[in-house]
Amino acid sequence: MPYQYHIQSNDDLVTPYQEVRAGFVALALERNRKATPFVEQARALKIRVSQIERPQDLLQMRDIRPTLLAASGVSDKAAGHLQEQDKVDAIEGLIQNFLEPAGENFVEELVYRFLLTRGDTLGGSMRNVGGILAERKFARYIISALTLSNTSYKWLDKNSKTWLNQPDDDTDIELRLRGLSWNLEGRNRTFIYNVNVPIVRKNIDICLFDCRQNEIEKNIISNPNIYIALGELKGGIDPAGADEHWKTANSALARIRTAFDRHSLKPYTFFVGSAIEKSMAEEIWHQLNSGILTNAANLTQPDQVASLCAWFIQL
């Protein structure tokens, strides 16, 4: 029972209050980090337009048209579908409805409108920030486990979508990492985040495959025999949403077991979560003791995650 190395009771799985508080602070810091480019753009916009005397002059400033469109409430995606005249109409609407009524304060109003739209953009990107931070943290623990066992690895860059060799300096590698591949004691293993598993017909947070990284392709992913372990990773820290996160994860794990059982297969299943309440912990503990769930860990507890990742790379 691999979970017994780091969990002795259901109470061990419950997220302590101080970790909830630390989690909210981490989310706030990430929001500020992501907001910084928008704030700097707003400052640059204010300096750029401070030289004009009236809002209508903005129509002649073609170099900042994308920014003016953003201030008009047009998203980057929507702008790609608009004709040139549509863009002009949107900016004229901004000028007539908001900037001209602001009088001599039209520059401040323009900056405000820009930040308002970018705030919505930021809000959308922040909806899954807990999940993104969780992926980074989990990846760092896997890398640490591999390093500790003196196992070299390749990593999948989510930006270039290419597999790269282990770097000499792996600082912040988790910011761009989508997967890892290694060979330990003659076993080729590759793990990837967010895989749409064909036989489950659902996107699964973590999948561990019995293959090299260069063998990962659609045909391989469709082969149920290639799966070693599948797990759900929930990084949301808000206790109010903890139960819903577990319900979603538990449903996905149940679908995994049912789908693979049809092929007489039983891959390992595990759950890692940041916000785990008492009732959730009791249910997870029951599933572990019953053999329904193979392993679990609270993401806010370093020893638990380190233990689970040490188990993970040995599979």
From Swiss-Prot:
The record's annotation in InterPro entries points to:
Restr_endonucII_AvaI/BsoBI_hel, Restrct_endonuc-II-like, Restrct_endonuc_II_AvaI/BsoBI
Looking at the record's lineage, which domain of life comes first?
Bacteria
| Disulphide-bonded residues | none
Q: Which Pfam families match?
A: Endonuc-BsobI
Q: Would I find Nuclease among this entry's keywords?
A: yes
Give the GO terms filed under biological process for this record: DNA restriction-modification system
EC number(s) given by UniProt: 3.1.21.4
- The top EC class is hydrolase
Instruction: Enumerate the UniProt keywords alphabetically.
Output: Endonuclease, Hydrolase, Nuclease, Restriction system
Any one Gene Ontology molecular-function term assigned to this protein's record? type II site-specific deoxyribonuclease activity
Keyword presence, NADP = no
What's the protein name? Type II restriction enzyme AvaI
Per the UniProt record, the lineage of the source organism begins with: Bacteria, Bacillati, Cyanobacteriota, Cyanophyceae, Nostocales
